[in-house]
C-alpha cells in the first residue's frame, strides 16, 4: 500500500511537472487503513517553488469499488500559532 501510494504520487507529480519525479524522491507523511480502504498523504522535495505542480498528494483507495483516487495540492502557507 505504501509503495503503491508513492508510485502513484510519483506518476502524478511527474505528469503535472512535465519531468520525472522518481518514486524514491517521494515520502509518506501520513497513512491510515480503515477496513478495505486506505489513505496516504505523500510529498516530495523535488518540486521547486514557482513550478505549477503541487507538492502534496492525497492517495485514497476505495477497497469496495477497487478504485484509487489521486488528488494533488500545493502548500500555500505554514505558520506557527502560539498557544
What are these regions (language model features)?
Residues 1-26:
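Short, non-transmembrane alpha-helical segments in secretory-pathway proteins
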Amino acid at each position: 500500500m505504501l509503495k503503491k501510494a508513492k508510485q502513484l504520487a510519483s506518476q502524478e507529480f511527474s505528469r503535472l511537472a512535465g519531468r520525472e519525479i522518481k518514486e524514491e524522491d517521494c515520502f509518506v507523511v501520513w497513512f491510515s487503513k480503515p477496513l478495505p480502504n486506505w489513505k496516504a498523504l505523500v510529498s516530495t522535495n523535488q518540486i521547486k517553488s514557482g513550478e505549477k505542480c503541487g507538492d502534496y498528494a492525497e492517495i485514497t483507495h476505495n477497497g469496495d469499488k477497487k478504485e484509487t483516487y489521486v488528488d494533488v495540492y500545493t502548500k500555500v502557507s505554514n505558520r506557527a500559532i502560539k498557544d
